[in-house]
Amino acid sequence: MALVLYGASSVFPVYVAVLLAILARILLTGALHEDGFADFCDGFGGGTSRERILAIMKDSHIGMYGVLGLVLYFLLLSQVLVAFTPAVAACLVWTGDVWSKCCSAQLINFLPYARKEEEAKAKVVYERMPIPAIAGVALNGLVALALLYVLTGNFLAAALAPLVVTGLMIRYLRKKIQGYTGDCCGALFLLSEFSFYLTALCMQ
C-alpha cells in the first residue's frame, strides 16, 4: 500500500494515489480486514445479546450497519491520508500497518475465542501466541516506529493510539461477547490503524 501510494503520487494527484493504494491493499488481501469490519459493525450494531451478535457476524450477507461502517471508514481514511505529503503518507502507511498489526494481534492473547471450533466461519480457532512470537511481533513494530522517526523526525506519540484502541476493544469484547472472533480481529486492525493516522494528523 505504501509503495503504491508513493509511486502513484508521482503520476496522479495525491487523492487518486491514496485511492489506488487503498484499492491495492483490498486486492492483495481479498478485503479480509474490511469484511471483518463490516461483519463487526453489523453484529454489534444490530445485536442486543451475545448470541444474536455472534449469529449476525456469522451471516455472510452485509447489512446496513456494515455498509455505513465501510463507507465512513473509507471516506475518513482517504481524507486523513490526503492531508499528508505523499512521502510522509507512505511512511505513515507502512509504519501504521506494521504497528497496528502488532497491537491488534494481542487480542488473541487476552481473550478466548467466542465460538465453538465447529461454529467458526473459516473453521480456524486462533491459538495464543508463544513468547517468542510475541517478541518477534513487538520487535517488528518497534523497528517500524524507529524507521518512521528516522525518516520524518515526528509522529512517535501516534503509536499510543493503537495501544489505547486495542485496550478499549479488549474491554468491550469481554463485556459484550466474552471473547473474540476473526471478524473482531479484522475490525480491530482497521480501527487501530486509523487511530494511528488520525493521531499523526493532529501532530502534523
Regions found by a protein language model. Name each.
Residues 1-30, 44-52, 59-204:
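Hydrophobic alpha-helical transmembrane segments
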Residues 33:
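Histidine-centered active-site/metal-ligand motif
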